[in-house]
Amino acid sequence: MIIKDQAALLAPVERDLRLDLFRGIGLWMIFLDHIPQDVVAWLTLRNYGFSDAAEFFVFISGYLVGWIYGPVVAGGWFLAALKRLWRRAAEMYVAHIMLFLLFTAQIARTARRFDNPMYEHEFNVFNFLSHPDELIGQAILLKYKPVNLDVLPLYITLVLAAPFIVWCLVRRPNLTLAASALLYMLSRRFDWNIASYPPGTTWYFNPFCWQLMFVFAAWCGVGQIDKIRKWVWSRTTMTVAVAWLVFAFVIVMTWHVHALEALIPKWMIKAIYPIDKTDLDMLRFTHFLALAIWVTHFVPRKWKALHTVWLRPVILCGQHSLPIFCLGVFLSFSAHWILTQYTKGVWEQLAVSFAGIIIMIGAAWLLDRAERVPSLFVKVTEVEEPDVAIESAPAPAAALAPASR
């Protein structure tokens, strides 16, 4: 019986390329959104609705955690799941610290080279360069973060909690989701958040609120979505979803065309604002759900285009989300200082934007090729104990995808 259970746990997990596709698209959007006043950024989601790539990444991460580790925990291998998820959290922590050091060095070097201290202030590294002895400790504690480095601490927190979330979802899925919703409401009501640096500030992504998206996604991943599938894709639900998407589009257009704001009743403006990203405003949450309903309707799992050469570049980026995200942070700042120091013309904006995406694709291709090269240090004989064997199961590499502001 143990051998049978172990074999079931080690069975290959069929990859859903849609998740890689949307993560890849999200990585491109993050890169473009981080370039101030970039004309190409008008292609990104945040300009046409309440949600953006952040919701996509957190949902995909939570869904994969539930989908991959739900059967593992249900099979009695909780410690194996905990070990792998905590190891992944440690990898992300190391990646965050390395990204922090290199990104800060890039900003400092650029500021010195062009004698332009604006970069140090704009990206919140001036205090670090002035007092590195104090702020390096704050950075290690995930309190001090330069601009655009807020997301990995959120993921680290969620992944550390993921084994216990999955354990609860496997046993009491609806009760766990209800507890998550209660924590979300209490956090918003009493302003619960994690302290940041300088004193008096808090995390840009409030984990007590963003956990709702993660837990809901994991709830779907452990199989609960199948119980409401008919309701989710009913005509009524899809009609409400498209109406909500249209409403969000109209509201967001008032941000870009101020003349349209006069068409929105004052009581409605008072009711919906502010649309808070830090605490995951419910308008953002529901907008993402409405979008997800229609996207999954038009892009089924067996969509043939997922296997075409045209979508291969963006899928490759999605399959290597952590390193590509880190690379995108450097590239977006590089594009920013190029446009700031030299020119902000439309053609130059197009050039740096597409050059950055091409570099991201190239890096993803190299990472993919590197994974296909046989290791020079393969153990010829290896007898795996059950818990070690679980470690050899398909890794949730996609379960940890970064997002952005």
Annotate each language-model stretch with its function.
Residues 1-405:
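Alpha-helical transmembrane segments and their immediate juxtamembrane cytosolic regions
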